[in-house]
Amino acid sequence: MTPSLTPEHLPALHNEEDRQMPRTIFDDAYYQRFYNEDPVHTAQKVAQLATAVDSLCAWWDIPVQSVLDIGAGPGMWRDWYHAHRQHVKVQSIDISEHACKTFGHELLDITAWHPKKSVDLVICHSVLQYLSNAGVSSAIKNISLSCHGVLYIEVPTTSDLEHVVDRKATDLEIHHRTGSWYRKLLSANFQQIGAGLWLSRRARVPLYELEHASK
């Protein structure tokens, strides 16, 4: 059984972080703003990232035959796999009707759904920051049920917003949460490897001590 945290046991946030008003509409205007002329992630950069993630999975002897792309947006991850790993089965999902109609995804919500069969690689690229605390807990529970191999996750934290992100290109209508808040939820079912990669605790993969984050 997959452990999960009930809302009353979720990691606490400071009051000022609870007042953030995240975006809830991901329509054509959203995609024009963040993915058109000056996107926060270009197709070339996502291709480099996908190449690296896929190669690291191969290095750890986790052959990627199946992929779930959550909040797939413009579909850059799916397109990379279709172009370079035609044998891999990719399921791309999104909660945006516009994204599903425009880019060809399935209209599914990871907070309330998971596939019947788990997959080798789950991608959750810039999704969790839009969800409520309870929504993140539900999403991570379903992600853990979806993944028996590797999870790639990117989510901007409070520190990232202060020190890392390009504030002109990044959507700032999101929840501001600390990295430790997300780690506490993820660590119940995943082991942090680094560079956004998390290994399912169901995976029987021996890692050198310095390949993963300290416990």
Model-derived features with residue positions:
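Class I (Rossmann-like) S-adenosyl-L-methionine-dependent methyltransferase catalytic domain
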Residues: 1-117, 131-138, 142, 146-215
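A conserved beta-strand element that flanks and buttresses the S-adenosyl-L-methionine
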Residues: 123
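Hydrophobic adenine-recognition pocket in adenosine-nucleotide-binding enzymes
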Residues: 127
